[in-house]
Amino acid sequence: NMDGVGTFEVAKVLQQHKMMTVITKTTTPDEWKEAVGNGLRLQSVSVCTGTNKIWDSEALDYSNMQKVLEMFPDIKMITVDVANAYHENFVDFIKQVRDEYPNKVIVAGNVVTPEMVEELIINGADVVKIGIGPGSVCTTRTMTGIGVPQFSAIVECADAANGVDGHIMADGGCVHPGDIAKALAGGAHMVMIGGMLAGHKEGGGELITCLLYTSPSPRDKS
């Protein structure tokens, strides 16, 4: 669900390796329709929404999600994504999503404490995303002072999820392949990566060309 990573181009590559892609919440139904017509496998993607609907009944992210799921009911997964899920309305929002979509897999987050993991699973989430601040472009810890070291959060939250028949997804902090192995060893049932895939041509980001001159170059010496 990260800009430059949660794209259809990335999804088409990852689906060849049995990997899921969470498509960004700003993607329109028309863009979904075009991607499906060009070979996107619905079983390999998740639709995504934020929580703007709590305050705005006509929130675009949620209405887009509804339209996409109506067009493509074979999509199995819904991801409800916010940087910090510690606000009083989040659990109630997950309840509402579960009531509206009883047969979908709901991924909710992000949190870092076992108590919140249990609360979300009990109230409708199948998978809880774990991680506040470890992502390569995340500033939540520095801006708000909220966060837990990622491996510690995974270990504690995995134990809580297992106790209520749920799952966790480690989200953030993976810089090297070994970090994925550590997350799985810590108890994560799945791992979300973003920064490791950022910058590839499939991400659709803006291409910037830079000319670098080394110190021995005549231009640099002039």
Provide a role label for each language-model segment.
Residues Y213-S222:
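Single conserved hydrophobic/aromatic residue that forms the stacking wall/gate
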Residues M190-G199, K221:
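Gly/Pro- and small hydrophobic-enriched strand-loop and loop-to-helix capping segments
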Residues H17-K18, G124, G187-H189, S217:
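Active-site-proximal glycine-rich helix-loop-beta segment
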Residues N1-H167, G195-H200, G205:
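Active-site entrance/lid segments in N-terminal catalytic domains of soluble metabolic enzymes
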Residues T113-N123, V175-G186:
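Catalytic cores of alpha/beta
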Residues R98, L184-M190:
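A compact, surface-exposed functional segment
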Residues L207, L212:
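Anion-binding and metal-coordination hotspots
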